[in-house]
C-alpha cells in the first residue's frame, strides 16, 4: 500500500443541485401561503402541490419585541428571507394564497399581508395567481362574547 502524499489527493466533488431542473427563462412555480393575523405574519412556501414545505419564516423570527411581530416591517423582512431561499432553490415564481384568521374571528387580513406580498414582488419573484383562502363559516358555533356582545 503506497503512502498518501500531502496535497496530492484528488477529491471528486459531486455536483449537488437543489430544487427542480429548468431551462433558462422557464418559470418554476411554488405556492406562498401568507397568513396575516393581528398577532403575527407567516410566510410559508411550499411546492406546487402544497405537500412539501420549502421555507417558512414568521414576523416573530425577525423582530425582538412581541408587539412588532405582526408589523409590516417584520412581514417585509420575512418575505425577503423567503425570496432569497427560493432563489437558491431555483423557484422564481409564486402563486399567492392569502389568509386571515377567519372562522368566528376577523376575516380581515392583518397589517403584514400587503407588505409581505409587495416584498416578494420587489425581491424579483414573479407573481402568478393571488387567492384569498380565509376560512368563511357556512353555519357554525356561536361567536365569543355572549348574548350582549363585548362591552368596553
Curated annotation (Swiss-Prot):
The lineage of its organism: Eukaryota, Metazoa, Ecdysozoa, Nematoda, Chromadorea. The gene is rps-14. GO terms for molecular function: structural constituent of ribosome. It is found in: Cytoplasm; Nucleus, Nucleolus. One of its GO terms (biological process) is ribosomal small subunit assembly. SUPFAM superfamilies: Translational machinery components. This is Small ribosomal subunit protein uS11. GO terms for cellular component: cytosolic small ribosomal subunit; nucleolus; small-subunit processome. Keywords: Cytoplasm, Nucleus, Ribonucleoprotein, Ribosomal protein. The keyword Lyase does not apply. Component of the small ribosomal subunit. Part of the small subunit (SSU) processome, composed of more than 70 proteins and the RNA chaperone small nucleolar RNA (snoRNA) U3. Component of the small ribosomal subunit. The ribosome is a large ribonucleoprotein complex responsible for the synthesis of proteins in the cell. Part of the small subunit (SSU) processome, first precursor of the small eukaryotic ribosomal subunit. During the assembly of the SSU processome in the nucleolus, many ribosome biogenesis factors, an RNA chaperone and ribosomal proteins associate with the nascent pre-rRNA and work in concert to generate RNA folding, modifications, rearrangements and cleavage as well as targeted degradation of pre-ribosomal RNA by the RNA exosome. The keyword Nucleus applies. PANTHER family: 40S RIBOSOMAL PROTEIN S14/30S RIBOSOMAL PROTEIN S11 (PTHR11759). It comes from Caenorhabditis elegans. Belongs to the universal ribosomal protein uS11 family.
Amino acid at each position: 500500500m503506497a503512502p498518501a502524499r500531502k496535497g496530492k489527493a484528488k477529491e471528486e466533488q459531486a455536483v449537488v443541485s437543489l430544487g427542480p431542473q429548468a431551462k433558462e427563462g422557464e418559470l418554476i412555480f411554488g405556492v406562498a401561503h401568507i397568513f396575516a393575523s393581528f398577532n403575527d405574519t407567516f410566510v410559508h412556501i411550499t411546492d406546487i402541490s402544497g405537500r412539501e414545505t420549502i421555507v417558512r419564516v414568521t414576523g416573530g423570527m425577525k423582530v425582538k419585541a412581541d408587539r412588532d411581530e405582526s408589523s409590516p416591517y417584520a412581514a417585509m423582512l420575512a418575505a425577503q428571507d423567503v425570496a432569497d431561499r427560493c432563489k437558491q432553490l431555483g423557484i422564481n415564481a409564486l402563486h399567492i394564497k392569502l389568509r386571515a384568521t377567519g372562522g368566528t374571528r376577523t376575516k380581515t387580513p392583518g397589517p403584514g399581508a400587503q407588505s409581505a406580498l409587495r416584498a416578494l414582488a420587489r425581491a424579483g419573484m414573479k407573481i402568478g395567481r393571488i387567492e384569498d383562502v380565509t376560512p368563511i363559516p357556512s353555519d357554525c358555533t356561536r361567536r365569543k362574547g355572549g348574548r350582549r356582545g363585548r362591552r368596553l
